[in-house]
Swiss-Prot record:
Residues 290-293 are annotated as: G4 motif. GO terms for cellular component: cytoplasm; microtubule; nucleus; plasma membrane; presynapse; synapse. Residues 221-224 are annotated as: G3 motif. It comes from Bos taurus. This is Interferon-induced GTP-binding protein Mx2. Interferon-induced dynamin-like GTPase with antiviral activity against vesicular stomatitis virus (VSV).
Amino acid sequence: MSMSFRPLKYKRHTQTSTQHHPKQDIYFHQQPPGPPLGQTMSPPQWQVEESNPDFLPNNFNQLNLDPQQPEAKGGQQMSKGPENNLYRKYEEKVRPCIDLIDSLRALGVEQDLALPAIAVIGDQSSGKSSVLEALSGVALPRGSGIITRCPLVLKLTKRECEWTGKITYRNITQQLQNPSEVEWEIRRAQNIIAGNGLGISHELINLEITSPEVPDLTLIDLPGITRVAVENQPQDIGLQIKALIKKYIQRQETINLVVVPCNVDIATTEALSMAQEVDPDGDRTIGILTKPDLVDKGTEKGVLKVMQNLTYHLKKGYMIVKCRGQQDITNKLSLAEATRKETMFFETHPYFRILLDEGKATVPLLAERLTTELIWHINKSLPLLENQIKEKHQRATEELQQYGDDIPSDEGDKMFFLIEKIKVFNEDIGKLIEGEEIVMETESRLCNKIREEFTSWILILTTNIEKVKSILNEEVSKYEKKYRGKELLGFVNYKTFETVVKHYLGQLIDPALKMLQKAMEIVWQTFKDTAKKHFAEFCNLHQTVQNKIEDIKTKQMAEAANLIQLQFRMEKLVFCQDQIYGVVLNKVREDIFNSMGKASETPQSKQPFLNDQSSISSIVEIGVHLNAYFMETSKRLANQIPFIIQYFMLQENGDKVQKAMMQLLQDTQHYSWLLQEQSDTATKRKFLKEKIFRLTQAQQALYEFPHFKG
């Protein structure tokens, strides 16, 4: 019988040391003195630092693989009851952890986020396949060149039943009746996925093995690292493999199992170098040394230094195993016999037997160690995993809302579908008009954006008044000479006043039209963005709506521009109500004469224009009227021009867009054409629905997990 997973007493070997070790029966990887209850009983160099999770039995690490299946004797009969109880606790507490992650992986959740896993990497001919064979109890593809051409998820489940296997990839599921079928089915799967050549693929192959002779463990086997392309391989095959490996080992959720032969310089191995690149402190990397029987004499101490973490430090340390070699396979050495030979090798080796005593050697202890590490890793990852699933689910739901519902096939249903789409769009346009749309914290509403342009219009009007004041003397003198008639010196010439007013009001037309243009662009872009938000996935409908928005904008722009120009033509009438003008005139006159009274106190040499008192009187009087009139006109224009813009470019523009959208419903023959989706929209919607479904299932699985403390 081959390997079996159960507690076993093992006689500890006498270590090569001057210190005396009494001979006693203990579990074969327990270290004296034992840790207190609640801590993992782990060998030196790879003691797990955290306390035991609540769902792990305190003596969890006393479970191991029994390579020899000895006859039950008196002492062992006495411990059978406690052993069975311990194993039952294991079945109840530990297996669900691995099953949970395997179920999430089976749902396809790994497409959306990284799951806790153990990834196995190694250079070509490192002995990686032999290690996996020893753990799984089945023969895997072997040979020269690239053998593993797709990531292989190896799910091992210990159960008291007949051996069963199942291989799954793409939409294919193949039940396996006995272990001998595994190698051929894996090769077949790789050829289907990656082709019959020597290329690789990122697509997963899932291999499930259920047997009483395997540990509870899930591993991901990755292609061996190669440096040089051979035969029909792509020239960049080495880069392709590294990219595939890095995709897995760079995830913080992955424990990296790096397989390295004992008979090579560990510093030159590509696998360990890649692991160090993504995990520089070795927090989640375990080194596995293979082929200890091929170590040259005199170099054994170098291997021991590696195992003692003195050569290439890894926080989780190293394990060492001796698996079947090519000669063993040729001689058809069974895995069970290979396990017994491995134990004998370490028991009798003058240098390496201490590693067996320390619990760092043999495949059974490696299996136990990996199971322990995986359980710890899963427990630590569960709270983060729950948050990630929740966030991904929310994002996918929000994204799906943007794509809307599936388009109905029935013509009557299409009408209601289109009505609903237009209704929601029109509601958003209405909110834009009323200044009630929902915006992000860093954004502002449409009405506020337009109001900012109106604020700049106030500045333009104020600047224009100041400009008139600054050149009043020069302008009035010029126009007095041109338009003065028979009136006596000092009288105000109305023609001069009127001409100055018309001239400076005329300079406001272009700024007003530019403000109209800016406001139009703001509204137009906002309406376009709203249309894109609602109709982007319906290319014909979206284009139709964009055209209508463009046509309406052009007409509204022309009407608003005409009305603004009409307003300025009316301003040439130079009119203001007597009651209003009289009040403003008196206030301005009072302000000006008060300022002139102060100015008269200054030396006359600084006011050359005061030499002609009659001219002063005329200029001051016209200045009073110009200031009064421009103040009142500016008030009128400050409101009137924004009124025109807001009415034509926002209010009426929005109303006409809404009516134009409703008119689309009258053309019943074009419903199918209008609702024609972009080629990838249906695919995206389907993808998001599937993603939401599997994330919902994942949330449910976590919720139902009895030991989850999230």
